[in-house]
Amino acid sequence: MDKFIQSFSHQYLDSSSSLKLTARRKRKLTILGLFLFSLISLMIIISYSNNNILPGLSGISISSTFSDYYSNPKQQNKFEQQIQDHQTTKKGKRTIIFPNNFNHVHDHKGSYMMKDSELVKYYVETMEQALDPEDLIYRNRFTYKLPNIPYTEQKIEMFSDGGGGGGDTSDSNTDMCPKLSTTIKVEASPAMNKNGDLKKILKTFLQEDSFYYRELSPFFPDLKKHFDEDTIDKHWYQFIGSTVWLEQYGVHLMVSRIIYTEKDQGSPKFSLAYLQVFDRNWKELDNVELIVPDPENISTTNNKNKNKKPYGYKSVLYPTIAPIPVYHNSKQTGGRFYGIEDPRIVLIKTRHGYEEPVLIYNSHHRKISEKHFDNDQEGKINFNNYRSLFIGWIWQTQLGKIHLEELPNNEFKKNEYIKIKEFVKPNNNRGRTEKNWALFINYNQRLNQGFDSHVYFANQLKNLKILKCSILNDNDDDCEWEFQMDDYEDAGVLHGGTELININQLLHQYDYPELNSIKDLIPNGREYWVGFARASLKNCGCGSRMYRPNLIVLMKDGKNYKFAYVSSFVGLGIEILPWYLDKGLCEHYNLIIPNGISSWTIEKDLHQKEKDKQVMDYMAFTISRRDATVDVVYVKGLLKALFTDSSSSKHLLAVEQTGFKSVTNVDCALKNSEKFCKIYGETF
């Protein structure tokens, strides 16, 4: 409304105009402008087709016992078809999704539930957004859905920390490997490829000609030429996908890395972060607008938690190349990896009570190392270069490159980027390269505080070190050490892969009676996290380098942390793609890289008869193959195998724990991974 009034006043009430308007006439014209704006808004609301509002809630009073509304499975299938029809037949039109808990309106009458039909009015009048008659708008009513896919049985060999006598020593003893070994059985699906249409993505980036494209285009000046010569697939690659399930919106949100290279996918010149949305069936949705919380905008519309401070909403559009501020110099590219590396997406719970997706990534930047000035105030500034760890709040923004550039730069100060912050080790101790980390959230801290105040990193996987970093503000505060096994520092060959999922949180989300046997046995003060690391083995018997996932189980007992289990290479029956499509599997790199855990749910087993159904857990995680794919793999029964199998569960749930100084299980896992590589090379 303010924008409309300003525009109206500028056009009709310019004081420099030859037409001298009286104050009375100005007021009349202002009133006329307000009337016209209201009339136009009303016409949009009235004329907007009810066919483009998915039916659902009606206006009913709400109470403290209000629970989020979701449609039944039959209705959800019907709504899904409507959305897919709209995506297919209304190209270029938006699909606008309000969160499921967008329900409370507070006014002089009290609180009531906003009708679905009122979403249009809110969007046009309160948010002051334009609406096309063919746009589709709805409040989410979709719940998570497992795909109906085949599974095959797979074995995973793991090595425990020793747990019992002799486990608390940093001296590795691989003679113990057979004794520490245990094998679990899970089931895994084939890899489902989710790569986007790079030609479409880059064409949109080129045609939109955003400030971000104009800023970075010197790194890929031949983009138009690549279209003309049809060589996009020789210079551009998409990989390293990481996703989260947005429960309030009923969609998967994915970030992936898109690189430009002059040679092949192993020599990137610049990296971009690409954000896109998939429905619950893993079908990509185009031109999707999510109505997300905006804590900077206080509003009378709130989420269901009446104890939280009211906040407004704003819209974010997907798919998009994320405008993340990065340091770059197109005149100095040798040996530098500019842009966004290894992006991971994770959900944090904010102080306002809602879940917010954030990105964790590495990026090349510089920091001032020395300043030299003479008496005439002329001098020289020296810089050190780093590949550091950052967080990006993708639903929040900042102007310019604060928290990145130390020198003022007027060229970028008015650009609106995603809000970022660098994570720095204690005592401002930046490592030259911060790439080998595994992210996790402390669930007990969330329960005690009601929100997440920190994120945690397994910063070094062998001779374990845990870093704790604040996310409550955007100040460049130093992180602090949560745990250090010892003073040994070396990244080693076991690197971070996916984030780690908190098992306590996973169990807490479900009330199946079958889970009580696990919940009741978890000792007080004990937390578990599970995810996939990745070992990088050079010249081990297949190509110059082999990567595979390594399952890891992180345990916290009191104030101490350890890897209770580390597995050798895990294949999971996933098809391998050769680095060079016209050559063998052991030419150059042979890899499966785990990137992120998309979801982990506990359901009634879909593959059993109704009367025989038991609870089963399903993990979805993303991988990359040949640094050129974005794939999703489902693993069935991993939680069950870890916590109900007689061997592993006995160790994980034991009250007395040792092994907090042991690295033997890591060495055993790496030793057997090398054996895996050698046998694989002899086979292929």
UniProtKB/Swiss-Prot annotation:
An annotated Gene Ontology molecular function: mannosyltransferase activity
Record gene name: BMT1
Primary role: Beta-mannosyltransferase involved in cell wall biosynthesis. Required for addition of the first beta-mannose residue to acid-stable fraction of cell wall phosphopeptidomannan. Plays a key role in reducing host inflammatory response.
Main subcellular location of this protein, as a coarse class: membrane
Topological region Extracellular: 50-684
A single GO cellular-component term on record: membrane
Origin superkingdom: Eukaryota
Disruption phenotype: Impairs the mannosylation of beta-mannose chains on the acid-stable fraction of cell wall phosphopeptidomannan.
The protein's name: Beta-mannosyltransferase 1
Keywords assigned: Cell wall biogenesis/degradation, Glycoprotein, Glycosyltransferase, Membrane, Signal-anchor, Transferase, Transmembrane, Transmembrane helix, Virulence
Annotated family: Belongs to the BMT family.
EC number: 2.4.1.-
Pfam families assigned: BMT
All ranges on the Cytoplasmic side of the membrane: 1-28
Organism: Candida albicans (strain SC5314 / ATCC MYA-2876)
Location of the protein in the cell: Membrane
